[in-house]
């Protein structure tokens, strides 16, 4: 309901978004910075993620231990994550501790000191994260897949960076990055829960006053390229990832047409891929599809793992299902897909963690809050021809594939 939503701008331009949920006893806080891996140049690969780690490692007023103790003292859950388009610092606390949580978040965003000792320690932590990534076949095949989709463009690179770039970062690099991207024009503070909007604005005005106004970040537009990649690794199964140019955030009607297509094609146990590949042929335990949306680009992805000697048959059957998907969609399939999408959306509205992220992402992408009722209206207006047309547009494009398995499957 839009009447529960409020938005204000502080004197420095910081956007404050709240959604009142009076029936809960907690608040969920998201501080969204419009910066991620796609904003980095070649020398900065991995700095967004490294900076997110460093935010918890000491400020002008708190040591790393004191930050951890301050979080634990109010019994909250705090963390952060980095994507290609956003870096998000989030917390969930009891409503009575909202001001204390905001105080900690404001401190780590505005007053981090980036000591040489902590940089050296966190470098080792991230190197372990990269090593863990290299030991995970799913991570490897998806990294290869996105590298082929976007090649040397920022969206095709890992958010973790490389050992070479990470080793070059100093406190000056972090301070310069903060100065460029962590400003009022580029940050969104979104809060959902049992709160009073006006009180939040007053608190935020006090805590975030040192943020400079700044300018919104920009990035180089992404271009889907595509291609084929292979990783030679001896595993129990071969994993296959197929993809096509998908749908971006820009057009919500097209986006939700693609969501419905994905549900029908590979989004659940009644989906075509699941029924054909797993239930009928027994070729894979896990198989499915989804659309990854970015601001100006999208990737429609199909994934499955199978026995080494079944890869060719798996690929053939997926291709057969793709052809069928471009020809017809039944009324029953559309109804099931809409019900799934509607149920997921409506049940998510009950969680303040979801609402906080939803209003923040809405504003950072669209510059406005798009209500669940507006989204449902879009979903319910979609017809069979819309889904078939979307399928034809997506599946007629350049294919990208990535495979991880034994060397004799290369170029199967």
Swiss-Prot record:
GO terms for biological process: proteolysis. Zn(2+) binds at residues 49, 53, 129. PROSITE patterns: INSULINASE. InterPro entries: Metalloenz_LuxS/M16, MPP/UQCRC_Complex, Pept_M16_N, Pept_M16_Zn_BS, Peptidase_M16_C. Divalent metal cations. Binds Zn(2+). The active site is at residue 52. GO terms for molecular function: metal ion binding; metalloendopeptidase activity. It is an enzyme of class 3 (hydrolase). Its cofactor is Zn(2+). Its EC number is 3.4.24.-. Keywords: Hydrolase, Metal-binding, Metalloprotease, Protease, Zinc. Belongs to the peptidase M16 family. This is Uncharacterized zinc protease RC0293.
